[in-house]
Amino acid sequence: MYRFAKWFFTLGVLGLVSTSIYSSVGGQNDRAPFPVPLSCYSEDLGSAKFIEAGCDKIHNVENYRDPVGGSVGEILSHRISANSFNLIASLIFLIAILHTFMANKLTAKAHLIHEEHDERMKAAGASEEEIKHDIPFKAELFHFLGEVEVVFGMWVIALLFVTIGFFDWTTFKNYMVYDRVFIEPMFVVVIMAIASTRPVVKFAEQLLGLAAGIGGHSKAAWWFSILLIAPLLGSFITEPAAMTIAALLLANQFYKYKPSSGFAYATIGLLFVNVSVGGTLTHFAAPPVLMVAAPWNWDMGFMAGNFGWKAALGILISNALYFIIFRGQFAKMGKQDDVEASANFDTPEVQTLKPGQISHEEFEARWAERETPIPWWITLVHLCFLAWTVFNAHYPVMFISGMLFFLGFMSLTATHQNKVELKGPIMVGFFLGGLIIHGGLQAWWIAPVLGSLAELPLMLTATILTAVNDNAAITYLATLVPNLAEASKYAVVAGAVTGGGLTVIANAPNPAGQSILGRFFEHGVNPLKLLLGALVPTIIMGICFMVL
C-alpha cells in the first residue's frame, strides 16, 4: 500500500468501526432529522407520519410539501428549491462516480511520472538502490487518487465541509453515528479475509474440481464450473464470500496466464453479473434482497420460486454464450498450464531453493502456490469460522470477535497457511463505507423516480440506477415508496440484481472481485470495458426475469 494512503485507510476504517459501535448506545431526539425524511415532502403538516418522522423540527418545513399532482421533474425541482443541500450532495456523489471512471487514467499518469523520475536519476548517476527508495511525491499522489477504493471515502471530506457549511458539525456527526450503518463494510472485510485463506480456497477448488471433472478438468471445464457454481453458492455463504473465492480461483486458473483483454473483461463482467443474481435463491445472502425481505415478507420459498431458478438459467445461458465466443483461448491456456507444471514448487529441485537464492517476492509467490496437503481438521476449523461469520453477519461484535480468534488459529497453523492479506479487504470495506455515506443522501431524487414508473420501465430504470448507486440502496428506497404494487416490487428487485455487474459500485461484492483481479489489468480495471463485458449477460438476465 502506498505510504501516503496508509494512514488515510487506517483512520478511515477505525472511523467506520467507532461510529458503528457508538451508534449502538443511543440516538438523538432533540434535533431536526438529517437528511430530510421523505415523509416531510409527501405528508401533510401535523399528520401522524409527519410528526413521527420529526418533520416538525425542520426549519421552514411548511415549504417542503411536494406539489400535488406534480410530475417527477416538478417534484425534484421543488425539493431542490426547498433544500438546496439536496443538489449539492448529489453533485458531490456524481463527481465521485466520475472520479471512479478516471481512476485508471490517474494510475497510468502515476506510472509515467515514476518512470520519468527514474530515468532522470539514472542519468544523474544514482544507484539502483537509491532509485528504488526515492519515490516522487507527485507519483504517490496520483497513485492514491487512482485507487478506486479510495474515491468515495475521499469525497466524504468534501461532503463534510459542505454539511458543516449548510448546517453544523453536530449534524454531520449525528448522520455518521446514528443514521448510517457500517455493518456491511465490516462484514465484507472479515468474510474476504477468511474466504481468501489457503485452506478455504483449496477446499473450494476441490469442490469445484468435482464439477470440472465432468469436462476432464480442462480449462474450459474449470471456467464454466467456477462461473456457474460459485455464484449460486453465494445464496448460502453470502455474495462477498462467493465473489472472493471465485475471483481467487479465476486468478489462479486463468488470469495469471495473461489472457486477451476481451477474455479478461468478459470474464470479470460475467463474474460480477452472475454473483449479483446468484444470491437470489435465498432471502438472506444478497444485500438488495435482504433490504426488502422483511418489509415485504419475502421468504426463501418466494425467492427461489420467483427469482432463483430464473437466475440459475440466466447464468447457464450467459456462460454458454461466452464459452462459445472464447473457446479458442481455453486450449491456449491449457498448453501454458502444461509448461508451468514442469516448474511446480513441489518438485525436488525447487524445494531445495532457499529464500537467499531467489528474490523474497519470488520465493513467497512460489510458496503460496505449493500443493502440499492441508490436514482435514484445519480446513474444517476454517469452514466453521466462515459459517460463524455468515451466521452472525448482522452482529459486528460476534463476527469481529470470531475474526480475532481466527487470526490466532492461523498463527498456530502457520505451516499450512499463506500470508494473511488484509490490505485488499480493508480497502474494499473503506470503499463500501464511503458509498454508504454518499448513498444515504440520494433518496430525495431516487424514490420519486422509482415510484412514478410502471413495471417494465421501473425494472429498466432500476437496472440503470444500479450502475451508479449500490443496488441495495435502490431496493431499500423502494421499500419507502408507499403502496407499491407487487409487480412493481418484483420489477425493482429484478432490475437491481440484473444491473449489479455493470460497474464496480453496482453491487457490494464487486469491489472485492476487483481488488483480487485488478492487478491483472494494465492500470487497473477500465470501467467502460467492464461495462461492455457485463452488458451481454445483463441483457440475458433481464430477459429471463422479464419474460419467464
Region locations from a protein language model:
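Intrinsically disordered, low-complexity non-transmembrane regions of multi-pass membrane transporters
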Residues: 21-82, 106-151, 209, 213, ...
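Hydrophobic transmembrane alpha-helices that form the pore/transport pathway of multi-pass ion
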Residues: 216, 220-280, 291-292, 476-494, ...
